[in-house]
Structures are given as structure tokens and as C-alpha cells.
């Protein structure tokens, strides 16, 4: 990608990867699938985040509101006092929706209206006058885990080999998305929609998904599905209802997936039923993916992955049991290193590609 500023020496250095970490900055932008969580980060050319702005909302905003907040945050992170070692060189954007990365267009956000075929790349290029790269948030997070996270080549951890050739990242948040990195490159597929594993049908006649279909993985194993199912079933079970109030400080509507895992370990039968469904249907989905692409690592991120070994150990066992030994023995399921920051770190990582 070339800049509209022309072929300066600085831009030639960008394309040849010869820039020093003090010669400028990149910006990472995160927009969630509902548009209610946005963040903008300023980073140096080593990927170190120097400053971050966030504008979380308690509701699903319209497109104009998101853009206004985005403009505010961009102005905040690019204030002159923050740019003492150069100018902004590139922007990376991680979006929680269907993205045509080749055209820089948001096809749709998964949980918000008004974003259909929105030219976000052009919008940011016009505003900042620098090159911009845009991708799905799971793809960006996958790249971040490979470049600087749990799947990076820097050392050994937990008995698995880092620097794997094929890595699958699975974001288990409000929705479920996947990002596949093969030999250091994100695999986008024919129409840039590879990795939409949340919409794999795993249970016939299962619960309704946000997309309108039934039995999708996202409707069973996403953070939102886990919390909603727990709240919905608890009304018929006073002991479970009391347990929810206890762990949430009497704010039952705020129960998290991690807290449902906690209640399951404490022996709550409703929580155990819900979590067993997560193991079953997420295990089926991952086992099928293992058969198809034979990854070395599966990295779990998002809110559900905050459950840590309460999720990972049983899920690894489930996948192992569903795969032939010769197929499944080489894959390891691990937790994201970047955690809740994976998307914004991924956006920065996008901006640094080929720099």
C-alpha cells in the first residue's frame, strides 16, 4: 500500500522495513461487533503501545455516533505532545464484523445496523492522510498472538512449541470468530470471510443465533449465550438464582461467563449443564476444524477464555477424544496471552505489517 504523500525517503524506508522505532508511530483502532466498544492506541514501530483511548458505551450506537467517538479518540492520541519522535505512518483497524480487507470495506457489523459496505479504510485515509489496513478482529487477534503472543516464536511455554506454522485463534466474546494464520500470513478465503466459525451449525434444533439461524456455535458457547442461558434457567431454580446474586453482588444481569464456570466448579447443577454444553459443542467444532486444517496450536481468547484451565483442560480432552490420535496428538489448546487486549494489539500488529 502506498501513501498519497509520494515517494519520499521515509516512505521508501517503510516499504523496505528499515525504519527505526523512533522514526514515527502507528495507530491501532478497535471497533467491536456491536460498535459499543471502541479504542484507539498509539504505538511505536516496535509495537509498544504508548497511549490508549477508550469510549465504551452501555448501548448499541448508530454509525454516526461511533465515527464521532472515533474522531475524538484519534484527535486525543495524535495530539502534538504525543508525537515528539515523528509522524503517524500507518493505521490498522480491527473490526468485529465481516470485512473485505482487500477493499477496506466493512460489509456488516455482527451486532449493529448501518455499517453495510461502509468504506472505513477510505474514511480513515482521508482523515489522517496515511495508509490504512483493515481486517476482521479475530484475524487481527490471531496475527497478534502469532507475532507477540501465545503463539509467537519467543521461547517455550507450557510444554508446547511456539512459532507454529498453522495457528487458529478463536475469540469467544459476545460472538465467536476465528482467525487462521498459516506460515505467518492470515488466511482470508475467497471472499475474505474465512473464520466465521461462530455460525457453524453444531446442534440440530439448537438455540437461535443472533443471525436468525438455529443451533450455531455462537448461540451456545459465546459469552453472551452462556450468561443469557444461565439467567434464563435460574428463574426455575432458587438455589442457582441465589448463587448468581452472590457472585454478582446482587447484579444478576451482569453475570459473566467466567462466573458461570466458577459456579459450575462449586457444584451448581445449572451452571454445570451449561458448561458441559460448551465443552460438547465447542469441542465438536474444534475437532472438525482440526481434521480440516491440522493446526499446531489453537489459541482461545475473549471473555469465555478468562476461565483459563477450567475451560482449556476439559476442552483439550474433548477434542482429543473426538480426533484420531494421529490427527489430534499434535494440536494444543492454549489461552491467549493478550487476553482482552488482543483486538487492539492486533490492530497495531496490522499497522506494522511490512513496516
Predicted segments with their positions:
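ATP-binding/phosphotransfer module of carbohydrate and carboxylate kinases, centering on a glycine-rich
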Residues: 1-89, 102-103, 126-130, 148-163, ...
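Short beta-strand segments
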Residues: 30, 92-96, 169-175, 179-181
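A short acidic/small-residue loop/turn micro-motif
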Residues: 56-59, 114-115, 193-196
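A charged helix-plus-loop insertion that forms the helical arch/lid used to bind
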Residues: 106-114
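General beta-strand structural signal in soluble alpha/beta enzymes
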Residues: 132-138, 180
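Active-site glycine-centered loops adjacent to acidic/histidine catalytic or metal-binding residues
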Residues: 137, 173, 347
Amino acid at each position: 500500500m502506498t501513501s498519497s504523500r509520494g515517494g519520499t525517503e521515509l516512505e521508501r524506508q517503510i516499504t523496505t522495513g528499515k525504519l527505526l522505532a523512533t522514526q514515527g508511530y502507528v495507530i491501532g483502532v478497535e471497533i467491536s461487533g456491536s460498535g459499543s466498544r471502541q479504542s484507539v492506541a498509539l504505538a511505536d514501530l516496535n509495537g509498544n503501545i504508548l497511549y490508549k483511548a477508550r469510549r465504551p458505551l452501555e448501548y448499541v450506537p448508530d454509525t454516526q455516533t461511533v465515527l464521532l467517538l472515533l474522531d475524538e479518540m484519534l484527535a486525543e492520541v495524535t495530539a502534538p505532545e504525543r508525537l515528539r519522535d515523528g509522524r503517524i505512518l500507518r493505521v490498522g483497524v480491527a473490526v468485529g464484523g465481516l470485512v473485505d480487507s482487500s477493499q477496506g470495506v466493512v460489509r456488516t457489523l455482527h451486532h449493529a445496523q448501518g455499517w453495510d459496505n461502509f468504506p472505513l479504510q477510505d474514511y480513515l485515509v482521508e482523515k489522517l492522510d496515511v495508509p490504512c489496513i483493515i481486517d476482521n478482529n479475530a484475524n487481527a487477534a490471531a496475527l497478534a498472538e502469532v507475532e507477540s503472543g501465545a503463539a509467537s516464536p519467543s521461547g517455550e511455554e507450557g510444554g508446547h512449541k511456539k512459532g507454529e506454522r498453522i495457528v487458529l485463534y478463536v475469540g469467544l466474546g459476545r460472538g465467536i470468530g476465528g482467525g487462521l494464520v498459516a506460515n505467518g500470513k492470515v488466511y482470508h478465503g475467497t471472499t475474505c470471510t474465512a473464520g466465521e466459525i461462530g455460525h457453524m451449525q453444531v446442534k440440530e434444533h439448537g438455540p437461535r443465533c443472533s443471525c436468525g439461524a438455529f443451533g450455531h456455535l455462537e448461540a451456545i458457547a459465546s459469552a453472551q449465550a452462556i450468561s443469557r442461558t444461565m439467567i434464563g434457567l435460574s428463574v426455575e431454580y432458587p438455589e442457582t438464582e441465589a448463587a448468581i446474586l452472590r457472585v454478582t453482588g446482587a447484579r444478576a444481569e451482569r453475570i459473566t461467563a467466567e462466573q458461570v464456570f466458577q459456579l459450575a466448579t462449586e457444584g451448581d447443577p445449572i451452571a454445570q449443564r451449561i458448561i458441559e454444553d460448551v465443552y460438547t459443542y465447542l469441542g465438536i467444532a474444534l475437532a472438525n476444524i482440526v481434521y480440516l486444517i491440522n493446526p499446531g496450536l489453537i489459541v482461545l481468547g475473549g471473555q469465555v477464555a478468562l476461565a483459563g484451565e477450567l475451560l482449556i483442560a476439559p476442552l483439550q480432552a474433548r477434542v482429543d477424544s473426538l480426533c484420531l490420535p494421529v490427527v489430534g496428538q499434535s494440536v494444543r489448546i492454549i489461552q491467549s496471552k493478550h487476553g482482552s487486549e488482543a483486538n487492539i494489539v492486533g490492530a497495531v500488529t496490522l499497522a506494522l505489517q511490512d513496516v
